[in-house]
Amino acid sequence: MGIIKKFRITTFKKEIPKISLKRISLSFNKRQILEDISFTVREGEICGLLGPNGVGKSTIFNIMIGLIAPDFGDIYIDQKKVTDIPIYKRSLDYGVSIVPQTGGLFSDLSCLQNLTAIGEIVIKNKNERIYKIENMISKFELEAVKNIKAKYLSGGQKKRVAIAMSLLSDPRILLMDEPFQGLDILSTRQLQQTIVNLQTEDSSRACLISDHAARDLLAISDRAIILANKKIISQGTPSELLKDENARSVYFGKDFKVN
């Protein structure tokens, strides 16, 4: 896999659990999808969720937001059990927001219209809604494309709009499902920096990001979790993972390094 250059110098010190999965298992049509999945994402942390395509990363996200109910196990937010809390309540009452792998944009709506559509759902006060949308357009450097339909935006622009949409509700837990997929190197580096900046600005938010490739994700992660064969095979800081022989043999390969 080669050498990865660190983007984020970790100053993360907190040990406050924000969202936890405890012994989650799931099967579908008698086929085991996930088995005994347990991990915690802490306040202020960027945590990576790594694993090959089809291993269940998106399924874990769907369980976390309440779209899928596990066969066994529980989900906790701020150490409160939310396993039976419906999806809309997890979003509005517990501050869970997701940037889906597909982006979640309405292709025939402009950047501004996409933001407004979500803003009208999550921000009731009109003046506050207008202010937040304008702030997101500025923060994500979308002014030049705000009136362009989403289907005409570049991959990097679409990702920035999708993240801006997810942040309108001021989430305490931000999930990003493969945000670097389909981006060129420059767009990936820009998005990495954007994510790091967001966490630096708000150290109370927990951020969980999935990817199948370690290179881009470990560069910004404080910790990471590796999935393989339905289970977690390792979790820890990037340095700890690279010292784990099981993680190296199953996932990284012997030549992978963090610079």
Regions found by a protein language model. Name each.
Residues 19-21, 34:
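Conserved structural motif at the start of ABC-family nucleotide-binding domains
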Residues 50-52:
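The feature captures the beta-strand-to-loop junction immediately N-terminal to the Walker
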Residues 65:
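Helix-to-loop junction immediately C-terminal to a conserved catalytic motif
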Residues 149-153:
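Conserved ABC ATPase signature
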